[in-house]
C-alpha cells in the first residue's frame, strides 16, 4: 500500500489532499455531532466557504444529514470513516511513526493520531477514541480498570462506548485527587467511564497530596484500605503523562517544592512521581493509590498523552515507565523522534 500511496502523491497530489480533507470533515462530524458549519470550520481551521462546499458534496453522497440542530453522520458515513481509517493513517505516514515510536520508547505498541492536541481539541478526542477502541477489543469480564485524572483521561471518558464484556468490569480511580476541577478528577472520570461502558465503579474520597500523618491515618481506615487494594491490584491501568511544573502548579504545590523541582530539572509527572530528563525520580507526592511498582503487576498499562509541548515529558517518563500501549498524536510523535535524533 505504501508504494501505491507514494505513486499517487506524485501523480495526483491534489486528489489525496482533497480525500484527506473530506475524511477529516466527515470524521469530525462523527465526533462532534450535531454540529453547525461555523463550529466545524472553527474546529478544523477552515473557511466556512470551504466547509460549505465539502458538506454539500458529502450530503449529496448520503454520508451526512443536515438538520436544524446541525450536521449528523449517516450509517453509511460511519462505514466510510471506519473503512478509510487505515488507509488515511498509511497515507499520512502515521504507521511509520508508530513503528519508530515503538522502537524509540520501547513500548509494546504505539498508536498515533493526526494533529496536535496542544491547539486542536478534536485531536484529544481522537486519542480517546483510539484508547476506547483498544480497550473494547482487549478487555475481559471481571477485570478492574484504574484511571488517573486529567484532561486527556477526561477525553477518553467522553469517547467511551458500551463494552461487550464490561457489564462485570469495575472502574476505579488510580489515586486520590479531591481538590482539582471536578471534571478532571479521577473519581469523576472513572464513574463516567463505568456509566457509558455499562460497568460498575468504586470511588476514593481522599485529597491529593497528603501529609505523612494524614496518609498513615487514612491507611488505617478499613473502607479506604479496601478500595486501595482494588486499585493497586487493577488489571488495566489508564494514565496520562504531565509536564512537571504544569502539574505541580495545577495541584497548588507550595512554591518551595516548585523551586526544588526546577533545581532538580523535573520535566514529567505521572502517579505523583516527578522525573528528570534521564527518567530518574526527583520528587514524589505522598498519595493514596497506584505506585510505580504496581504497574509491573498489571496485565495492561495504557499511557495516553499528546501535544508537541509534551514531547520532552513523554520521553522522560518512558526512560523507566512501563507501558504496553502508548497513544499520542502526530505532533508529539514527530517531536519525540526529532529529539532522539539530535
What kind of feature is each model-predicted range?
Residues 47-48, 146-155, 179, 243-245, ...:
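Gly/Ser/Thr-rich loops at beta-strand to alpha-helix junctions
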Residues 99-109, 167-243, 253:
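Ligand-binding beta-strand-loop-alpha-helix segment within the catalytic cores
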Residues 152-163, 249-257:
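Short Gly/Thr/Asp-enriched flexible loops that form oxyanion-binding sites at enzyme active sites
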Residues 251-279:
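Gly/Ser/Thr-rich active-site loops/lids in small-molecule metabolic enzymes
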